Amino acid sequence: MAAVTTDLIRELRERTSAGMMDCKKALEENNADIEKAITWLREKGIAKAAKKAGRETKEGRVVSYIHGNGKIGVLVELNSETDFVSKNEDFEALGKEICMQIAAMNPLYLNEESIPAADLEKEKTIMRSQLEAEGKKADQIEKILPGKIKKYISEVCLVNQAFFKDDSKTIDDLVKEAIAKFGENITIARFIRFQVGGL
């Protein structure tokens, strides 16, 4: 298998506007062949989604979900560029899927950028202390820490979480698929989860 270099990832990003991890995965799946990787990204709708990601989303709807036992409720603000899309049944279905994800997986934040710096530092300190307690040396800790932080982010940030119905994709991937399908930008603006007797 050919090596996936940072130069190849950079070139693919420049040519498709797709995210770094999407480009890396596309190259890995296609033996570092950039043309095949572009086709792969297009088939997945990622290249198209990335080009639309900068567009403003002023329309949308609030989608709600109450879990079967009546003890968990979720509200999600899902935005689109036009009301034509936000009134679509498939858009509503996407909102329901995201609500069920939140009910099931209880994310604390929307995305990595919404984690307060103090909270992230606190987690890093805890992780560092755990690794020290396991007898890891300082240089080992610095190599292990980024992976542990990435795992933490994938657990607590909605868009980074594995989709509960198909863990081969994230919620971000689910939204990108919808962007490709509808042909316009879609964003999750915010969410709130209620639980009887909980926070």
Curated annotation (Swiss-Prot):
Matching Gene3D superfamilies: 1.10.286.20, DNA helicase RuvA subunit, C-terminal domain (1.10.8.10), Elongation factor Ts, dimerisation domain (3.30.479.20)
Keywords: Cytoplasm, Elongation factor, Protein biosynthesis
Chain intervals for the UniProt region annotation (Involved in Mg(2+) ion dislocation from EF-Tu): 82-85
Pfam families xrefs: EF_TS (PF00889)
Key word Cytoplasm present: yes
GO cellular component, one term: cytoplasm
Subcellular location: Cytoplasm
InterPro entries in UniProt: EF-Ts_dimer_sf (IPR036402), Transl_elong_EFTs/EF1B (IPR001816), Transl_elong_EFTs/EF1B_dimer (IPR014039), Transl_elong_Ts_CS (IPR018101), UBA-like_sf (IPR009060)
Entries under CDD domains matching the protein: UBA_EF-Ts
GO terms of molecular function: translation elongation factor activity
Protein family: Belongs to the EF-Ts family.
Main function: Associates with the EF-Tu.GDP complex and induces the exchange of GDP to GTP. It remains bound to the aminoacyl-tRNA.EF-Tu.GTP complex up to the GTP hydrolysis stage on the ribosome.
Name of protein: Elongation factor Ts
Native species: Leptospira interrogans serogroup Icterohaemorrhagiae serovar copenhageni (strain Fiocruz L1-130)
